[in-house]
UniProtKB/Swiss-Prot annotation:
Family to which this protein belongs: Belongs to the FARP (FMRFamide related peptide) family.
Record key words, sorted: Amidation, Neuropeptide, Secreted
One Gene Ontology CC term in the entry: extracellular region
Source species, domain of life: Eukaryota
Cystine pairings recorded for this chain: none
Keyword Secreted included in the entry's annotation: yes
The keyword Transferase is assigned to this record: no
Phenylalanine amide found at: 9
GO process terms (BP): neuropeptide signaling pathway
Listed name of the protein: FMRFamide-13
Compartments, as annotated in UniProt: Secreted
Primary location group: secreted
């Protein structure tokens, strides 16, 4: 996914 995949919580 994108670089902001860590924002998925």
């Amino acid at each position: 996914g994108p670089s902001q995949d860590f924002m998925r919580f």
